[in-house]
Amino acid sequence: MGTFPPTSEKRSMEFHYPNFQNDMWRVYGLVFFDDKEHFRKGEEKAFDADKIKAFLSEAGIASCPTVLKAIREKGNASDAFLKVVEPVPLAEVLEQIPDCKHIGTTGGKATEILLSLLPEKVKLPKTGETIPFVFNGRELTLTRLPSTSRAYPLSLAKKAEAYKNFFKACGLQTK
C-alpha cells in the first residue's frame, strides 16, 4: 500500500505507481524476474499496466493506495506535502481479499496513514520491520518497506532486497 498517485502529467500509465521515475515496477521486476526492465513498455518511458495487472493477479498480490482523496500542496509527488482528505476504507478493502494476511506499506507516510485507520494505537515500525496487528478480529502483519521513490536514499538493489524478503515471508516465490 502506497499513498496517492502523482499529478496526471507525471503518469506514464493509468495504474498504481504510474510515474516512470518511481522504481516500484523495477523493484518488482528484480524481485520476481531478476530483470528491472521486465515491466517496461518496450523502449518507451512507461510501464506496461496490462502486464503488471496480469502478474499481480497471477501472483495473488493486491495493490491499493492508503489514500482515496488528497491534496498535493506543492503539486509534486512528495508525500511530505500530501494532505489526506479521505483515507482508503480499509475494512471494505480487506473484505474483498479475505485471504490477505500480510500488508506491506511503501514508506513512512503510507505506514502512518494505515496505522491511523486502526482502532488501537500501534507503534510505527521502522523501515524493514514487521509487526502483528488485529483489524476487525483479523490477525495480520504489517511490514514497512522502503519507499520506491528515487528521492529515498537507498539503492535499487537494497530496495529490491527488502521487497524480496517481504514477499518470501509472505510465501511467494521470488528470483
List PLM regions with ranges.
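Secondary-structure boundary/capping signal
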Residues: 36-37, 101-102, 122
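Internal catalytic-core helix/loop-beta-alpha segment
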Residues: 58-117
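Short C-terminal domain-edge/linker segments immediately following a structured domain
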Residues: 29-36, 92-98, 172-175
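Short, surface-exposed acidic-centric catalytic microdomains
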Residues: 9-82
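Generic structural signal for beta-strand residues in well-ordered domains
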Residues: 54-56, 96, 135
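C-terminal capping/extension of enzyme domains
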Residues: 6-11, 18-20, 27, 74-91, ...
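N-terminal nucleotide-binding beta1-loop-alpha1 segment
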Residues: 1-3
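Residue-level marker of positions within ordered structural domains that often coincide
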Residues: 6, 33, 68, 108, ...
